[in-house]
């Protein structure tokens, strides 16, 4: 049953990640909606709504302007799922969401470096007039990277639990977290 629940959460996370990138803007990236869907599918709608509302408030307080903001949504989803699956209280979901958000931000920052290379690959394909390849890179490679950067951390953290998230977050050097914070802050002032 744990594996089935984990796979459900992974599918929700894929929908959440591809929402604004492929499906338009259906607001699947909002913790209130994501956690509510998680609660509904995992059999505890009340906890899903409560965690979603708490995380939505936290997200509104940390909303950034620009492309380098934090991904509180993945942390919210993981926290909600672990809370429902373990029967823990709502405060536990928030406690799990913070390190998961940090891990998610670091993973996305690294993925951004790879996505920049995709842009160069598209430019090179267009210069060679290989438009099919340029289209394939844009439509397949980018979303595939988003999905990979989502399913691996979500699956591992939900399946193995909060202890894994906490232990990984505690090993991250301070210079990495400081760099991520600096990058997010620079985007706020448009540098």
Can you say where each PLM-predicted feature lies in the sequence?
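Alpha-helical transmembrane segments of multi-pass membrane proteins
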Residues: 178-187
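Alpha-helical transmembrane segments in multi-pass membrane proteins
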Residues: 8-12, 31, 35, 39, ...
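Helix-loop-helix junctions within the multi-pass membrane cores of secondary transporters/permeases
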Residues: 94-179
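Hydrophobic transmembrane alpha-helices
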Residues: 1-74
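Conserved small/polar residues in nucleotide/adenosyl-binding loops
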Residues: 189-191
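Hydrophobic, small-residue-rich transmembrane alpha-helices and their short perimembrane loops
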Residues: 53, 57-121
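Generic secondary-structure signature for well-ordered alpha-helical cores
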Residues: 16-20, 47, 83, 87, ...
């Amino acid at each position: 049953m744990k594996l089935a629940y984990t796979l459900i959460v992974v599918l929700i996370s894929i929908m959440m990640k591809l929402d604004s990138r492929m499906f338009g803007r259906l607001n699947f990236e909002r913790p209130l909606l994501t956690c509510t869907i998680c609660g509904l599918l995992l059999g505890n709608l009340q906890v899903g709504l409560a965690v979603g509302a708490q995380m939505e408030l936290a997200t509104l307080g940390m909303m950034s302007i620009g492309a380098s903001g934090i991904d509180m949504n993945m942390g919210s989803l993981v926290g909600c799922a672990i809370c429902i699956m373990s029967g823990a209280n709502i405060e536990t979901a928030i406690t799990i969401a913070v390190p998961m958000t940090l891990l998610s931000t670091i993973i996305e920052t690294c993925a951004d470096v790879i996505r920049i290379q995709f842009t160069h690959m598209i430019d090179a394909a267009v210069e060679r007039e290989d438009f099919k390849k340029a289209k394939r890179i844009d439509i397949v490679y980018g979303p595939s990277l988003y999905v990979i950067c989502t399913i691996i951390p979500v699956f591992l953290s939900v399946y193995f639990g909060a202890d894994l998230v906490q232990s990984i977050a505690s090993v991250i050097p301070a210079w990495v977290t400081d760099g991520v914070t600096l990058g997010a802050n620079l985007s706020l002032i448009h540098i």
